[in-house]
Amino acid sequence: MAYNKDNFRVKTAEDAKEIGKSFLEEIDLVRVVDFGLPEVDDRYLVWRVPLKSKSGERIGELVIDAITTLIDRNKTTDKVVLENRLLGRIEKKKRKNNRSEGVKISTLRNTIGLGDSEELLRELPSQSVDLVFTSPPYYNAKPEYAEYFSYNDYLIKMQKIIHECHRVLNEGRFMVLNVSPVLIRRASRSEASKRIAVPFDFHRLFIEEGFEFVDDIIWVKPEGAGWATGRGRRFSVDRNPCQYKPVPVTEYVLVYRKKSDRLIDWLIRKHPNQQLVKDSKIQDGYEVTNIWKICPAHSKDHPAIFPLELAEKVIQYYSFKNDVVLDPFGGIGTTARAAVKNERRFASFELEKKYVDMMKKNILKEAAGKELNINYINM
């Protein structure tokens, strides 16, 4: 059934704020939480109302059905989460006066986990990881495959993962995401294919979960790499205006930092092992622009892997030797391999056992007999 804004019972931002005020009164947070600017989401027929601390930092979101005026409790930030984030802001203010506090060194062992990454992440201690690098699973790249009921369900799951990654990351450290728009192929000849701008939705999730945007790196593949998707072939034959579709040969590598009142150079100046800092210095031949030309990787064992070279660059540029590098969607272990190769520790999680078995094999091969002292979860 199609709706337009005439059907909305929540018509204005003020209407949304009034409903939000009732919600905050109900959960007894009306005196400590403010509203950001409410926005209507035409795709899902809801109002999204940012929830902020009194200092202006975003701590969550209220989602209101624009037609029924009901609050979507499943998609609205939970009271416990709001309270924890408010307490976190207060603790952060207290730390501002302690400028001599040094960089924390994680004691986490190398870890391989089998299972849902959201659940596995909960087993990691807070502030036990120094870098997160991952490529999230594609959203329903094939019409016959539907792991998620909707794109919104997919984003909700990804936000939960990002939330846990924020918790386990050390202060001021980085989370780097390899992601690209997704083409949903048409289910029949009478339907059009659809391209979803996934990276831009992920950006919103990162900001909501307490990260700050640092850089957008463009991974450029050789010109012929994108033809496998079939995109652009029809135009190359007919050349009709309005049918132009460029062949995608790029992906995003988005860089975010866990918010901190400390500057980035604090990570270097206050590191307790200055020899490790020197040993981690990036060598000549590094990337000087945000355009990285790297050939894609292919594997008969996994349909979607990124190249080892990409993982190595990210690890070298955003971590020190002996740091812990986390990949919550570990696949066959590319990130973990790159970590071992570059003298870092790793934590790598994967849902499917066949990939975990390959991951373990690939990591041990990369280690070439070096003792890794791996902690296995659910294995």
Residue ranges: model-predicted function:
Residues 1-38:
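Short, non-transmembrane alpha-helical segments in secretory-pathway proteins
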Residues 2-7, 57-59, 71, 76:
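Long, contiguous binding/interaction regions
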Residues 27-67:
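Exposed beta-strand-loop-beta-strand "reactive/processing" segments of non-cytosolic proteins
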Residues 61, 73-77, 263-270:
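Short, charged, solvent-exposed linker or helix-capping segments at domain edges/interfaces
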Residues 66-90:
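A short, surface-exposed interaction/processing loop segment used at functional sites
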Residues 84-104:
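DnaQ-like (DEDDh/DEDDy) 3′-5′ exonuclease domain used for proofreading
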Residues 97-358:
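Core catalytic lobe of class I
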Residues 101-107, 360-377:
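Short, conserved SAM-binding/catalytic segment
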